[in-house]
């Protein structure tokens, strides 16, 4: 047996190189939109579907692929299959004859990369028995780095290989992840199911209703900046009602609705993660526009300055993992929420008149909050999830990220309209203060619930 096959770091590298593909491709595409728009002769609204369809497909596929990994296919097989799909999309994209074909390839990329995360988290849950929070911190570091550096990498690739390069750059990461995963991931017993049992386990009607509900919800949220679309909203509520009704009727539902009542900690983790992503995607999307439109900064300077936030977030992630491993997730989750309020307050009252270095300190404070919250909530999700549903629950966790990001777009659209001026920036600050206050309230409730459960375990003599 080769020594590196038993190496924890190599095992996590195999997973991290795969799970980072989704955030990398969601952020890197932004630099290629202009060139793709002109090459295919499109409007900006049309070409932006490359982003919207990726979000929609990812939001739906994450929990669906998690369900498949929980009940039908081994996590190892699902992880490797996802890598193959992303590889196929990377190879085919440069040869797309029409924009419609490119959209299909982009959907394939989203589906493949979305299958990787829940299966990767499941592999950690099943095979990494010590310091799981630190293991999740590795995934968070890679994901945060790719989200932050994706636009920079995309801009560099555009200068050397035009827009096809942003697809082809996936191949080295895929090859490394596939080789290590194929060699390292333990082979699991095949889940031998009859076709009827497979259909029942998957709950295909439930998956379909969930897909319709999520697509309508995200479409409704994306359209809020142009006014409330009542028909879409009503259809979303109807499909949500039908989905909840159906899930209560079947013996093995796609998503156990009762779980959200029984596992209140998990429900609160999802709520906090949505809040965290609304808050920070408002900054990710809003700050670059403010720096360029109001302050007149160049794109390169804006990108480098945003590293004050994303860089601190990346650096604090491994420390947060160790913090959670040595104690519990309560204190990091609450600390993240308090830092959100501190950062939002500093941005509202001091950011505009602050000198260059002062603005950097405010972004660093905000990055501290995001890095701590990201890792702590992933660890909290893992601890609160039923063992047999870890794939589905981790997939839903990522769906919450997409809900938060799209809700942030709606918030920015309603606040700013066409441009971000100084007065608008203050409105954003007050909005973020209110969001962070909600986050603190939920975090306090979550902390009291975790503390109460720990007290009950101690009273019962359970470690």
Where is each model-derived feature located?
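Primarily marks hydrophobic transmembrane alpha-helices of the MFS/SLC 12-helix fold
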Residues: 78-79, 102, 333
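Hydrophobic transmembrane-helix bundles of small-molecule transporters
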Residues: 161-272
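A membrane-interface helix-boundary motif in multi-pass transporters
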Residues: 159-171, 222-229, 414-436
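Cytoplasmic helix-loop-helix junction between adjacent transmembrane helices
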Residues: 108-141
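Conserved MFS/SLC helix-loop-helix module at the cytosolic interface between two early adjacent transmembrane helices
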Residues: 60-97
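Helix-breaking motifs and short loop linkers at transmembrane-helix boundaries and internal kinks
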Residues: 41, 73-74, 94-101, 129, ...
């Amino acid at each position: 047996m080769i020594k590196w096959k038993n190496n924890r770091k190599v095992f996590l590298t195999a997973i991290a190189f795969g799970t980072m593909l989704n955030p990398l491709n969601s952020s890197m595409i932004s630099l290629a939109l202009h060139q793709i728009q002109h090459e295919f002769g499109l409007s900006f609204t049309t070409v932006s579907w490359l982003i919207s369809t990726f979000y929609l497909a990812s939001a739906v596929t994450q929990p669906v692929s998690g369900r498949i990994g929980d009940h039908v296919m081994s996590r190892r097989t699902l992880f490797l299959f996802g890598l193959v799909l992303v590889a196929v999309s990377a190879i085919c994209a440069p040869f797309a004859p029409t924009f419609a074909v490119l959209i299909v390839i982009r959907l394939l990329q989203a589906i493949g990369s979305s299958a990787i995360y829940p299966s990767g988290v499941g592999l950690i849950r099943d095979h990494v028995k010590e310091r799981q929070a630190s293991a999740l911190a590795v995934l968070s570091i890679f994901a945060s780095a790719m989200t932050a550096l994706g636009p920079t990498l995309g801009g560099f690739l555009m200068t050397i290989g035009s827009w096809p390069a942003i697809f082809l750059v996936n191949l080295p990461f895929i090859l490394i992840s596939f080789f290590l995963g194929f060699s390292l991931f333990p082979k699991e017993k095949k889940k031998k199911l009859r076709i009827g049992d497979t259909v029942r386990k998957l709950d295909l009607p439930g998956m379909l209703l969930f897909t319709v509900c999520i697509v309508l919800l995200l479409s409704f949220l994306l359209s809020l900046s142009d006014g409330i679309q009542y028909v879409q909203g009503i259809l979303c509520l109807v499909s949500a009602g039908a989905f909840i009704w159906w899930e209560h009727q079947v013996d093995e539902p796609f998503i156990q609705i009762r779980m959200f009542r029984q596992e209140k900690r998990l429900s609160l983790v999802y709520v906090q993660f949505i809040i965290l992503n609304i808050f920070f995607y408002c900054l990710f999307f809003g700050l670059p526009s403010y720096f360029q439109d109001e302050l007149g900064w160049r794109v390169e300077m804006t990108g480098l300055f945003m590293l004050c936030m994303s860089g601190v977030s990346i650096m604090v992630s491994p420390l947060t993992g160790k913090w959670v491993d040595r104690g519990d997730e309560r204190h990091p989750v609450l600390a993240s929420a308090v830092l959100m309020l501190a950062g939002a307050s500093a941005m509202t009252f001091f950011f505009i008149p602050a000198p260059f270095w002062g603005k950097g300190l405010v972004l660093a404070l905000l990055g501290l909050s995001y890095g701590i919250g990201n890792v702590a909530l992933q660890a909290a999700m893992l601890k609160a999830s039923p063992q047999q549903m870890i794939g589905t629950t981790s997939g839903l966790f990522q769906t919450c990220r997409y809900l938060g990001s799209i809700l942030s777009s709606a918030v920015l659209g309603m606040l700013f309209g066409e441009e971000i001026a100084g007065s608008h920036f203050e409105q954003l600050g007050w909005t973020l203060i209110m969001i962070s206050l909600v986050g603190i309230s939920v975090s306090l409730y979550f902390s009291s619930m975790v503390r109460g459960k720990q007290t009950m375990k101690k009273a019962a003599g359970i470690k």
